[in-house]
């Protein structure tokens, strides 16, 4: 795996990630595990969109994948969530946008540290 870091994003459906994101995690996790832990010591961050509730369990689902795969998860100023129902509404979530920007700064910092 050439990437030094991975960001997985998903909408929140019924307090969990989308079926597509779950399939990616399940398949990539198995392939990684069966081939010597391909994601070990790489950076990973979860980014979720939610209408209202249920985003924290979805956020956890992605982070469990990273942590079980021995990945390094950078923090931010809050959970990496954006709130909105219709397309474009998440962009109006000022706290969510700030959290994402802070995550980007922290991810870039971590990638530089891990690379060296």
Regions found by a protein language model. Give the residues of each.
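Glycine-rich phosphate/pyrophosphate-binding loop and the adjoining helix
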Residues: 1-2, 72-116
